[in-house]
């Protein structure tokens, strides 16, 4: 969603935002020049679309005007402007496939999988047939620049693939087993999302391309549920802790109190932020230690916020009742993807916590830093219900 009457506003900021998201993305796109034949590095990274599923466009992201490694390392990025500049310098080069085509091990798709699994940038050669000069912004995925339909796509060098990735591929592990195995051996969620999307994981007879948007949430969900099963045997932590962090116009408060596992995310979109131009919007979702069956009403941001909390609890070998507050401010003028949430909560939990005697004391302290005050009633009600039912 963009603010009302964009055609009338024409970038004059009548919506009240600090910057126009439409003009901002095209400001960088004007600098991109693309030839009919390209030979450029991929970070490596892949994009799989969802329009037309099960026939989708898929292919590598190629870096045209930026360092390919930095352009695919969200934990290093510093500002919204930098993210837009970096990501719109990446060209989506694609061809159309059926999602099941990966089972046939065609050379074109096999090379794409090898490129995606590589640990260093890989040069990609492509003959471009058609270019769409349209950028894409999404609440789950990172921003995307121009897209190009190619006559052909091939690797210009041999990629180096980690041994453990080759193991899960040739051992025919189920997808959730492969994800847990690789995650527990130190592979990042960003890497896992890419190889999951490329159809590298799972039993050979069941492998398929997975749209990028779906793969991001799937990895957060599958890995998170695996960690929940681990921490179910742990005792509650012994102190009430409060962490906070802010980046990219997203403010985070994280409260951990010594109780059995319960996770709750409160999401507050301030008026004039990207998805809520007219008024503040508040959403809440929660869970206990049982597997979360229904897809969260807060979309992929819920699973992205939950994962670093579960990582922290596993590291501390404890359970906790957890409240995460995410307040999105007007300075978040363009959606950047759920990595903003994952990294924000992760960095909050790496900071030095405040220690309190009770959850209520921590909640009061957190409230002072949250500008919207209406959310507290929702938290109080949810917490009392959780206690009543013994969650």
UniProtKB/Swiss-Prot annotation:
Keyword Ribonucleoprotein: no
Zinc finger (C4-type): 6-20
A Gene Ontology BP annotation from the UniProt entry: DNA repair
Keyword Transmembrane among UniProt keywords: no
Keywords: DNA damage, DNA repair, Metal-binding, Zinc, Zinc-finger
Subunit structure: Interacts with the DNA polymerase sliding clamp (PCNA) via the PIP (PCNA-interacting peptide) motif.
Family designation: Belongs to the Nre family.
Domain remark in the UniProt entry: Contains a predicted C4 metal binding domain at the N-terminus, which could be a zinc finger DNA binding domain.
Full protein name: DNA repair protein NreA
Provenance organism: Archaeoglobus fulgidus (strain ATCC 49558 / DSM 4304 / JCM 9628 / NBRC 100126 / VC-16)
């Amino acid at each position: 969603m963009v603010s009302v009457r964009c055609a009338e506003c024409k970038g004059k900021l009548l919506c009240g935002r600090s910057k126009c998201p439409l003009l901002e993305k095209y400001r960088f796109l004007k600098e991109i020049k693309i030839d009919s034949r390209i030979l450029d590095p991929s970070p490596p990274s892949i994009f799989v679309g969802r329009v037309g599923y099960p026939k989708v466009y898929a292919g590598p992201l190629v870096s045209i005007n930026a360092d390919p490694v930095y352009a695919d390392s969200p934990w290093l990025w510093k500002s919204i402007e930098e993210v837009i500049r970096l990501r719109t310098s990446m060209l989506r080069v694609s061809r159309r496939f059926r999602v099941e085509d990966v089972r046939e091990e065609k050379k074109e798709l096999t090379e794409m999988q090898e490129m995606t699994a590589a640990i260093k940038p890989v040069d990609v050669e492509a003959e471009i047939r058609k270019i769409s000069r349209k950028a894409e912004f999404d609440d789950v995925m990172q921003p995307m620049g121009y897209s190009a339909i190619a006559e052909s796509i091939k690797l210009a060098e041999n990629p180096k693939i980690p041994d453990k990735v080759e193991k899960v591929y040739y051992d025919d592990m189920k997808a959730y087993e492969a994800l847990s195995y690789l995650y527990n051996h130190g592979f990042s969620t960003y890497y896992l999302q890419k190889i999951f999307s490329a159809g590298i994981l799972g039993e050979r007879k069941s492998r398929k391309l997975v749209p990028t948007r779906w793969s991001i949430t799937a990895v957060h969900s599958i890995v998170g549920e695996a960690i929940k099963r681990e921490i179910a045997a742990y005792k509650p932590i012994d102190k009430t802790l409060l962490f906070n962090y802010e980046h990219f116009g997203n403010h985070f408060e994280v409260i951990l109190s010594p109780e059995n596992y319960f996770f709750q995310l409160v999401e507050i979109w301030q008026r004039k932020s990207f998805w809520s131009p007219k008024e503040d919007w508040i959403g809440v979702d929660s869970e206990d230690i049982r597997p979360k069956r229904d897809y969260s009403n807060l979309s992929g941001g819920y699973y992205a916020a939950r994962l670093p909390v579960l990582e922290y609890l596993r590291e501390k070998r404890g359970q906790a009742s957890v409240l995460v507050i995410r307040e999105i401010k007007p300075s978040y003028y363009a959606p950047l993807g759920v990595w903003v949430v994952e990294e924000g909560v992760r960095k909050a939990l790496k900071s030095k916590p405040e220690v309190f005697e009770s959850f209520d004391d921590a909640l009061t302290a957190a409230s002072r830093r949250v500008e919207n005050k209406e959310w507290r009633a929702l938290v109080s009600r949810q917490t009392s219900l959780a206690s009543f039912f013994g969650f």
